[in-house]
Amino acid sequence: MNYIVFDLEWNQPYSNDISFMKRTKMPLTGEIIQIGAIKLNENLEIVDSFTMYVKPKYLPHMHKHVKALTGITNQDLNRGVPFRAAYSHFQQWCGKDYMLLSWGADDILILRENLLLHKLKSIDYDSWADAQMIYSFHRYGTTQQYSVAHAMEDLQISTEELSAHNALHDALFTAHI
């Protein structure tokens, strides 16, 4: 079995964007704009990586806070592929026998929302684990939430050359933890 450590970046609607809810016909936290993942083998060794920009369908213009946080531009998104294609590539890359992991539940929840939005089969929670809770429990015997930055510092893992809030970088940080 492989372990797929994934991270997502997503655009969000402005709070007063009622037309967004009319277009989606459902409440939505945000629209995925980048998928990043690291594949680990059964020995927890990194064997591959995946990254792809997703061209948004419902939120075509970057929210100013998301743009500032991620550095993702409209030009990056214009080079992306539609969500259905991006997710299909991601699934093919994952293979057949794998467990998904993410830092906290936000990424799996936004993925499930976007799968529902695009009428694709949802992820089963049995095939996902919360790396943040695993870290917290094994390191401190608690379920307290710790940031990736805290865990990296705690475990003395260097992140100097990579920036946070890039889906591939964040997945790599989590894989190292």
Residue map of PLM features:
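Entry/capping segment at the start of metal-dependent catalytic domains
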Residues: M1-N43
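N-terminal start-of-chain detector that recognizes signal peptides
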Residues: V5-N11, T24-M26, F50, I72-T73, ...
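Metal-dependent phosphoesterase core characteristic of DEDDh/y 3'-5' exonuclease domains
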Residues: G30-I35, K39-T70, Q91-I177
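Metal-dependent phosphoesterase signature
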Residues: H65-A86
